[in-house]
A protein has these predicted regions:
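ASCE RecA-like P-loop NTPase motor cores
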Residues: 1-595, 599-602, 642
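Acidic, low-complexity intrinsically disordered tails
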Residues: 1-2, 442, 578, 582-656, ...
Length: 673
């Protein structure tokens, strides 16, 4: 099936040229291109049209799961009849195993898995292995972490056809090998049940369709395959064929398990002897005890805690070989799209180093075998070798993308709304606060919002305190404000509960605030990370969704970064104005409802200035005096709330419940029976 876009929009402005240039580049063999699109120019729509033109399976890479979820929703809407999949980390909460030698502290791995996301991941791999070409996978960098060998996974897929001859018991054994469970009492995803010559199976992947399947035998021949509602038993359509995929991405065979056990045992002896030779008898003893226990668990149950640290043995990889990952499931001619590439690429670069540093201590101090080092994300070089064709998407592409694209940069600066890049005004720092207060007064009178960026957290807090005393409704945001509160503050700004938001780094990608008409940058002439060309451009872009958008640089001199930002902004404005004049377009204010990411909680608070955050649940005196039974009930209730939030892909709220859960569990440990 081909990619077909379903949209009421048609390409306008720079869209046609950008779509044509990128599509032609891919068809003519240009390996890498950059889409330089300004804020609000419809970059996602352009990429969707490129995918339609080139008709290639596509991986869209985002730097966090929240933005990945937004992209997934958008592409799902553009391609309702194609396979648009979502692949992110399935952990609602994850504390990796670690050892801190300086304090002799061992931190055990702790996690909570989101089963619905696990099924979405499984569905993504199934779509890729199905052979269909109309597949789009929207993913976080989770796609670069280890997975099962795609060949071994494909071998566990059971293909059934009407009229096919297969022994029923042999089929049931294949289901068990694919980790399905025979369960007549609770027929759910990942289960099968047998009733004479009839076998019912509830595939893990088909959960989203609510379908189970009935396979009816006549002797050793499949006589009929039909779908049915697992709750009511109502039968639907008959099927000519059916693919049953494993319930887990890490499925393996008993033969591989036996081989792995033997190899682990040999490597254990080698590493224990090595630790003794270098004068670490205690570490050698610890390693022997831990790995021996793991081997017993694998022999008896087929798995153990931390089995991922032995993945090299189960995959049949040599020491140092890269792990298999989602990229191995794509055909060789797939298209990579890196969203917000100026952030995503550095994140990919850093992944391996962070993982290596943590694992190195675990191996050196006898907690893990050296094989744990091979359970890792891809190195950046490995990532590059697996992605020969790509498009980098950013309003401010970094040097890497520009060099990699070899000058093939496609601009998209015309917005469908006709909005222009904001005017940039440079003013002296003398009396800058008084001048800013006057600007804020003017904007507040028009029910518009203001963003102010400072260089330090202390400056942000002190400026907030000063403005509050002067009667300005304001709040501040910086790295010490947690993710949940940060999103709530953004919602409150949009909803008019305060007028001014002060922060250190307000250039966060995905920050969509059409009510903001003024961005004030204090100390704009202080060269550095927060005042680089890219940072200034990203921050200035926050005012680009408002028809009255304006940026003020408070500075006593014009730096190279400031000049570059102003020159680029003026160039874009001239092009945008010329286009609007030629086509009779009047800029229109972006009207966008404020949809809270916090499960649309009702905001009932009065408009406020700077206030202290509300105390957490654990700080409640009632909770402090709960007995063990009451605390256990509170823990269970909080865990359910966390799971429900995660099922809705509301990771921000799930994280809040997770933090409360950890605190409640810590409190429970202090209670005596």
């Amino acid at each position: 099936m081909n990619f077909e876009i379903s949209s009421s929009f048609s390409p306008t402005g720079d869209h046609p040229e950008a779509i044509a240039a990128l599509s032609e580049g891919i068809k003519s063999g240009v390996p890498f291109q950059t889409l330089l699109g300004v804020t609000g120019s419809g970059k996602t729509f352009t990429i969707a049209n490129v995918i339609k033109e080139v008709q290639r399976p596509t991986l869209i890479l985002s730097h966090n799961k929240t933005l990945a979820a937004q992209l997934y929703s958008e592409f799902k809407a553009f391609f309702p009849n194609n396979a648009v999949e979502y692949f992110v980390s399935y952990y609602d909460y994850y504390q990796p195993e670690a050892y801190l030698p300086s304090t002799d502290t061992y931190i055990e791995k702790d996690l909570a898995i989101n089963e619905e996301i696990d099924k979405l991941r499984l569905r993504a791999t199934a779509s890729l292995l199905s052979g269909r070409k109309d597949v789009i996978v929207v993913s976080s960098v989770s796609c670069l972490y280890g997975m099962a060998d795609p060949t071994a996974f494909a071998e566990k897929v059971t293909h059934l056809e009407r009229g096919m001859r297969i022994d029923r018991d042999k089929l049931l054994r294949r289901f068990v090998d694919a980790l399905y469970v025979n369960n007549k009492l609770e027929f759910k995803s990942g289960c099968f049940r047998v009733n004479g010559d009839t076998v019912d199976i509830f595939p893990a992947i088909e959960t989203f369709d609510g379908m189970a399947y009935r396979i009816e035998f006549w002797d050793d021949e499949i006589d009929r395959i039909s779908s049915f509602n697992p709750l009511t038993g109502e039968e639907y359509d008959e099927q000519d064929e059916l693919n049953i995929y494993p319930t887990n991405l890490f499925v393996t065979t008993q033969e591989r398990i036996n081989m792995a056990i033997g190899q682990i045992d040999v490597d254990l002896g080698t590493q224990v002897n090595f630790l003794k030779e270098i004068g670490k008898p205690f570490e050698a003893k610890r390693l022997y005890e831990r790995v021996t226990f793991d081997l017993e668990m694998i022999r008896e149950l087929g798995h153990c805690s931390g089995i991922e640290n032995y993945s090299r043995y189960f995959d049949g990889r040599a020491a140092g070989d890269r792990p298999f990952c989602l990229l191995d499931y794509f055909p060789k001619d797939f298209l990579l799209v890196v969203d917000e590439s100026h952030v995503t690429i550095p994140q990919i670069r850093a992944m391996y180093g962070g993982d290596y540093a943590r694992k190195k201590n675990l191996v050196e101090y006898g907690f893990r075998l050296p094989s744990a080092m091979d359970n890792r994300p891809l190195t950046f070089d490995e990532f590059e070798s697996l992605t020969p064709l790509g498009i980098y998407v950013s309003a401010t592409p970094a040097d890497y993308e520009l060099i990699k694209s070899e000058g093939v940069v496609v601009e998209q600066v015309i917005r469908p709304t006709g909005l222009l890049d904001p005017i940039i005004d440079v003013r002296p720092s003398l009396n800058q606060i008084d001048d800013l207060m006057e600007e804020i007064t003017q904007r507040s009178a028009k029910d518009e919002r203001v963003l102010v960026t400072t260089l330090t957290k202390r400056m942000a807090e002190e400026l907030t305190t000063y403005m509050t005393r002067m009667g300005v409704r304001c709040n501040y945001i910086h790295s010490d404000v947690d993710t949940l509160e940060r999103v709530q503050i953004m919602d409150d700004l949009r909803n008019g509960l305060f007028d001014v938001l002060i922060g250190v780094n307000l250039l966060r990608e995905g920050l969509d605030l059409p009510e903001v008409s003024l961005v004030a940058i204090l100390d704009a002439d202080k060269e550095g990370f927060l005042r680089s060309h890219r940072s200034l451009t990203q921050t200035a872009g926050r005012a680009a969704r408002n028809v009255n958008g304006k940026v003020i640089f408070y500075a006593d001199k014009i730096t190279a970064s400031m000049q570059q930002t102003m020159d680029e902004t003026n160039r874009r404005r001239e092009k945008q104005m010329a286009y609007n004049e030629a086509h009779g377009i009047t800029p229109k204010q972006v009207m966008k409802n404020s949809v809270s990411m916090l499960a649309e909680k009702q905001q009932t608070a009065e408009p406020y200035a700077y206030i202290e955050p509300e105390p957490s649940l654990v700080a409640d005196p009632v909770v402090q005096y709960m007995n063990r039974t009451q605390l256990e009930k509170a823990i269970e209730r909080t865990r359910k709330q966390m799971t429900e939030a995660a099922k809705k892909l509301d990771f921000i709220e799930a994280a809040q419940f997770r933090d409360e859960l950890v605190k409640l569990e810590d409190l429970l440990k202090t209670k005596k029976d």
